[in-house]
Structures are given as structure tokens and as C-alpha cells.
Amino acid sequence: MSSQLADPTYQGDLGNGLIRRWSTAADQPKIGQCLATVFRPNADAPLNVRSIDEVRILMSGAHPFMGPGDFAIVEDTNLPERPVVACTCCWSHTWSYAGIPFGVGQPELVATLPEYRNRGLVRALFEMAHARSAAKGEMMQVITGIPYFYRQFGYEYAIDLEGHRTVAAADAPARKEDEPEPYSLRLATVADIPHLQALYNQERDKSLLWHELDDGYWRAHITSWDDPAIQGKDVTQIGMIGPLRMIVDKDGAVCGYIWLATKRWGSALRVFALQLYPHVNWQQAMPSLLRACRAHGEQTPGIRAESKPFSEISFGLGRSHPAYTVLGEKLAPRGEPPYAWYVRVADVPGFVRHIAPVLEDRLAASIATGHTGELAIDLYRGGLRLQFEQGKLAAAEPWRQPDYGDDPPAGCPPLVFLQLLLGYRSLAELRATFPDVYAEPEAALLLDILFPKQMSMMAWMSYT
């Protein structure tokens, strides 16, 4: 048994008969029971069987983001069945910043049984998750989650997440009777992986941050629907949200892909991804795709008996998308702005050093090309010192305000700085919002060059 938080054999005593440890395959039923109990509408509702199936998928050994030993759990040893009373799982990804790859850890499925809440169990589990992520060399942790909660663990909202435009299903344009449908959908196969990679990565250069997906991800996404464990089951009871579909023309040539849900959480059919090759005309394709989505939605069941009837198509494609432009205000008058990813970067100087080539390229392309000088940024609980020599980053290191002397030329709350670092907000936007963000003119010029506002398109990519 190890005392190291990241070690698979670690076990820690939390008092009152509670221990924290890493999962094994044998824990799957108890983890599923915990999540199925927590993720339901109310205490009297049936267990959420989709959560049980999701745990089966995640712990199968075939999931691209994690394995059976990647749940951090708390179990109650006072009870004979030693139930799992709190848990989170730890996914691992490769993202990139302007093309520079780095590791990312993602805690997900964070849950505590109601009777065990307010005991610090999630904090204890996040200590384990952060330790394991650090042991893997991951420079960043991210999470999608409920408002505010994860700020207490060092996370800040710093990347767009989703964003929706909604079309009334009845408004899908009718096809002329004498014209064949120009585009149709078919299920993706492993033979489509080169197309999926090419279509997905079309947007890579437009996004500051990017989720680097290998062929194994697409293969798992596709073949998971062939699993004997789900054959013949009600789709509302399984943990996966929907298979990938290829968009093909009248001749069967691949023109794009779309990711549609196989169940509804309300009246809307959700569209998680949509991409077309550059040679395909979006204006010509969208009417056909709307009709295909409407037909699919009419066959898509709600997850509850009381679910509202299908009436809408919700395109969750981010802040902007070619489909939104084509739909316009007439077809998609109602939208929802993006939520955001929570982001944690424990070693900001280390991350800055990692992306130094990008910063140097930005300097070289600016009016400050060949810059030599120091920039100290007060982060209030510490700071960051950047030293440039002839346009090259010579140092990025922790800095602390001395007891006496002038204030540094720039200051920013420590977590808010992540919004600047990751291009989520400009310096001017942060200064207009936070009174404790400041920069003297020369420092402001340099910060604007080094950390410009830039869009990141980071979609939810798990198929569960």
C-alpha cells in the first residue's frame, strides 16, 4: 500500500471509517450505484440506469480517456457492503496551444451521496486527481460542471463550452417533390476514420486551444455501438449519447459528418457536432440536413415518460459556426451563449515556458520585435516574472512583491490571469471588469502582444 496520492495502491484514512483510494475493476458495481443514486431528479426517483451503464463503458478498458483504475473513490468501511459514497473519474487528453501539445487531466462524474456531503470528500478526491494528473506530467486540468463549485479547488472559467442555436422542427424547409434529396446520413464505420480526422481538424488552425484526437478515439466512438452489452437495449437506458453519422451526397461520396443524440433530455434533438468539407456549399446542404435532423428527432425518445414531445433541433456548435450563419435569425431566432470550461494551471510559469515559441512568434510579428526587458506581474498571492532577451523568452519564473519599493507594472488576480493566458478575455476586457487588474502603458502593450484574445473551440468529445 502506497502513501503517494497518485499511486494505484494508495489508500488514505479520512476518519469515521471513510477511506479514499483508487478503483479497481471490481469496484464497477459500487461506483455505478453511487452515481445512479446521485444523478437522478429527486430522492424518490428510480436509480439512473444510464449512469450505471456509463460506468461500465468507462471502466471497460476500451475507453480512450481512462481505464478501470482511474476512479478516485471514498468508501465507508463501517458498513458491511463497504459502499462507494463519493467518487470522481480522471480522464487524460492531449490538447495543444497554437500547435504546441501538452497533457490535460479532466475530473468528471463528481458525486457524493447526500448523507455524506459537507465533509470535504470532494476536496479529498480532487487532491488525488490533481496528484495523478501531475504524476502524468499533465500541465492543465479542466472540468465541465455546476456553477461556481470548482473555483474552490483552484479552477477558473477560461474557455468557451458549447453555445446553442435552436430551430423549430416544423420550420425545416420542405423538399420539392420532383427533386431528390441532395444529402443523406449513414452511420460511420471505421473505414470513415480518415474522413473524420480530416473533417474534425479543418478547424484546428482557427482555434488557440485544440483537443488532439488520434484514430483510437474515433475507433472507440464508432465500435462502442457494436458492444454486445447494449444490443437490443432501450437507447434511453444506455450510457452513450449517440453514434457518429456521415453526410453523403447522392452518389454516396462523403461530404461531412454529424453527431446526433439518440435520446432527448427535453423537447429538443441535440446536435453535438457538424462539419462539412470546404467544397460543400453550406447553403445548399443545410435544408437537407434540417430535414434529416427532423426525421431523426421524430424517432428519438425522451429519457422519461413525461418528456415533452419532440419540437426543436438544438445545434450545440459553439459561439459561431457556418450553420448558424446559414440558419440566420429567421430559422434560428433563439440562441444560448456558451457556458465555459473550468481550467486549473498549477504551474503558470512552467506553462508559459512551454508555450514560449508561440510568445516569441507573437513578439516577432509585432511592433515590439526583438524586445529585451523584464515584465513582472503581481498575482497577489505570488507573481510571474518574464524576462525577454532580443525577442526570446529567457525566463518565466515565480515572483513576489518585495516588502518595499514600487508596485510592479501589471497586476491581476491569480485565477483571472488564466483568462488572459488562454485568450478567453482581452486585457482591456479584464480591466473593465476587475478593478484589481491593471497595467502601465508599456506593460499593457506587451501583454496585448503576448496574450491576445483568441477563440478556442473546445467541444465536449466524450461519447458517454
Predicted feature descriptions by range:
Residues A43, E54-A72, C87-C89, G99, ...:
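N-terminal, Lys/Arg-enriched amphipathic/low-complexity engagement segments
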Residues Y157-E181:
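Flexible glycine-/small-residue-enriched beta->alpha junction loops
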Residues M1-P29, Q33-P46, D53-R56, E75, ...:
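Intrinsically disordered, low-complexity, positively biased terminal segments
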